[in-house]
C-alpha cells in the first residue's frame, strides 16, 4: 500500500518526488529551500525545526557516539536490482539509533533541568539510550516500563544507572504514569519521538549517510512515531532537495499511513517489529512526514522475518524487526527501486535470542532448507532403517525423528514417522519425496 506523492514545503512541482534523479528544482524552489533551512511551515503547523537544527545536533553529538558505517552491499544489490547502501545503526553502544535523539536532548538541558533529572516511558531502545547517556552526563534518569517488560530489558536499563518503575500493562499506561510522575517531581519529560531535539538528533543519520555515500538518491526509513524519518527528511532535503524519501511501517501497526490517509487504523495484537509498533504518530513528526516523504509502504510479518534472515546470512549482522523493515520494503517493492541508489537504515539490533532462533528456523523452512516429511511404513523391524538409508542416498540430513503408533489413524500394522530434514532447497525436497515413493514408501510434505 502506498500514499500519493506529496509536495515539499508547499512548493509546486510538475512530477512526484519519487523521480529522485530529476534535480532539485522539482522538489523545492530556492525560496522554499531557504525557508526549509531556517524554519519549517508544514501544512498549518509552524514547526520550530529546520535543517540547521540537524546540523547543530551533528556538531553536539560528534565524538559522543559511534559514527556508524554506511556500506555498499553487493549481494543485496544483485538481489533487488538497486544499488543498496546499509547504515549500521545497530553498531551503536546500545544497538539502536535512539541514542542520537536522547543524547541531543540531554545536551540541550539547562543546568537546572540537569539537576532535576529526566523521565521517559519505554520498553526498549529509547529507555536504554536515554539511561546510558544520562549516566554519562550525570543526569538522574527515571524510566517507566510496562509491568510485563522482559526482565533482560529491565535489568539492562537499571545497569545504565536509571531508576526503573514498572507500571501498567502496556506502553500507553506506562506513559500516562510517567507524565504524572514528571509533573509531581518536576522532572523533564523526554518524549520518544515528538520532540524537536529528538527529531534533530535522529536526523544526523541522514547527514552521515549522504557524506559517506553522496550518490544515494533514495532513502527507505522505518516509521514508528516518526522521529527518525522526520529528522532524516529535514536533513536529506537540506543537502539534496531532489532525494526520494520513503517510509515503511509494519502492516499490523499502520498508524502514520492511516493518519495521512485519513482512515481509521486496525491494529494487530503484536509484531516482531515492536520498535515501530506505535498506535499514535507524533504531531510534529506527522506534519513533517506529510510534506517531505513521498510514500509509505506496509510490510507483513513474513517480509520482516525474511529480511532479518537475509541480513544475518549475507551481511553477518543481527537486526531486530524494525531494523529489517527498510530491506523488507525494498524486497517487496523492488520494481519501484530498479536502478536507484538506495540507502537503508538498520536502526536497531536488540532482538530476543529465542525469537531470533525461531525466525531463523522459519526462514529455513521458507527457503526449502528445512523440511518436515511424513512417511507411512510397515511397522516391522528394519523398516525405519530402510527409510533412513534411502534418505542418506539423496543426501538428506536428519534433524529430528518422531515415531508415532498410538495416535495414528493407520491400520495397526502400519506406522507414521515424521522426519525433520536439513535440505538444500525446494528442488531437493521434491527429490527426497520422489525417492521415498519410488522405494515403496508413502511420503508427503508438511506445509
Positions of PLM-derived features:
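PLP-dependent amino-acid enzyme catalytic core
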Residues: 41-447
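Composition-driven detection of intrinsically disordered, low-complexity segments
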Residues: 17-20, 24, 43
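Cationic, low-complexity basic patches in intrinsically disordered or flexible, solvent-exposed regions
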Residues: 13-16, 39
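Cysteine-centered motifs
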Residues: 8, 27-28, 36
Amino acid at each position: 500500500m502506498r500514499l500519493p506523492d506529496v509536495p515539499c514545503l508547499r512548493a509546486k512541482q510538475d512530477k512526484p518526488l519519487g523521480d529522485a534523479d530529476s534535480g532539485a528544482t522539482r522538489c523545492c524552489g530556492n525560496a522554499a529551500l531557504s525557508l526549509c533551512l531556517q524554519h519549517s511551515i508544514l501544512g498549518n503547523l509552524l514547526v520550530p525545526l529546520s535543517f540547521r537544527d540537524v546540523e547543530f545536533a551533528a556538531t553536539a553529538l560528534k565524538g559522543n557516539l559511534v559514527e556508524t558505517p554506511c556500506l555498499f552491499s553487493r549481494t543485496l544489490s544483485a538481489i533487488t536490482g538497486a544499488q543498496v547502501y546499509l547504515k549500521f545503526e545497530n553498531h551503536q553502544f546500545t544497538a539502536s539509533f535512539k541514542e542520537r535523539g536522547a543524547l541531543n536532548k540531554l545536551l540541550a538541558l539547562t543546568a537546572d533541568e540537569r539537576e532535576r533529572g529526566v523521565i521517559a516511558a519505554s520498553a526498549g531502545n529509547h529507555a536504554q539510550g536515554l539511561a546510558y547517556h544520562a549516566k554519562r552526563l550525570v543526569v538522574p534518569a527515571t524510566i517507566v516500563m510496562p509491568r510485563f517488560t522482559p526482565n533482560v530489558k529491565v535489568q539492562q536499563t537499571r545497569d545504565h544507572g536509571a531508576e526503573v518503575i514498572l507500571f501498567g500493562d502496556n506502553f500507553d499506561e506506562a506513559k500516562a504514569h510517567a507524565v504524572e510522575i514528571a509533573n509531581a517531581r518536576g522532572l523533564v519529560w523526554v518524549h520518544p519521538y515528538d520532540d524537536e531535539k529528538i527529531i534533530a538528533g535522529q536526523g544526523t543519520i541522514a547527514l552521515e549517510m549522504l557524506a559517506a555515500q553522496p550518490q544515494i538518491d533514495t532513502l527507505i526509513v522505518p516509521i514508528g512515531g516518526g522521529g527518525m524519518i522526520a529528522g532524516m527528511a529535514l536533513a536529506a532535503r537540506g543537502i539534496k532537495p531532489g532525494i526520494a524519501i520513503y517510509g515503511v511501517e509494519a502492516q499490523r501497526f499502520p498508524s502514520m499511513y492511516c493518519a495521512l490517509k485519513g482512515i481509521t487504523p486496525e491494529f494487530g495484537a503484536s509484531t516482531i517489529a515492536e520498535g515501530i509498533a506505535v498506535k499514535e504518530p507524533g504531531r510534529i513528526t506527522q506534519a513533517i512526514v506529510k510534506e517531505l516523504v513521498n510514500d509509505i509502504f506496509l510490510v507483513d510479518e513474513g517480509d520482516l522475518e525474511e529480511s532479518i534472515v537475509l541480513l544475518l546470512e549475507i551481511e553477518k549482522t543481527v537486526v531486530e524487526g524494525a531494523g529489517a523493515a527498510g530491506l523488507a520494503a525494498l524486497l517487496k517493492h523492488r520494481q519501484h527501486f530498479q536502478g536507484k541508489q538506495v540507502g537503508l537504515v538498520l536502526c536497531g539490533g536488540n532482538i530476543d535470542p529465542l525469537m531470533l532462533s525461531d525466525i531463523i528456523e522459519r526462514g529455513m523452512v521458507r527457503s526449502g532448507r528445512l523440511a518436515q516429511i511424513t512417511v507411512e511404513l510397515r511397522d516391522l523391524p528394519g523398516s525405519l532403517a530402510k527409510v533412513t538409508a534411502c534418505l542418506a542416498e539423496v543426501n538428506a540430513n536428519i534433524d529430528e525423528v518422531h515415531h508415532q503408533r498410538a495416535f495414528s489413524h493407520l491400520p495397526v500394522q502400519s506406522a507414521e514417522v515424521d522426519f525433520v530434514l536439513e535440505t538444500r532447497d525446494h528442488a531437493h525436497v521434491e527429490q527426497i519425496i520422489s525417492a521415498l515413493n519410488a522405494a515403496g514408501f508413502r511420503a508427503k510434505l508438511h506445509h
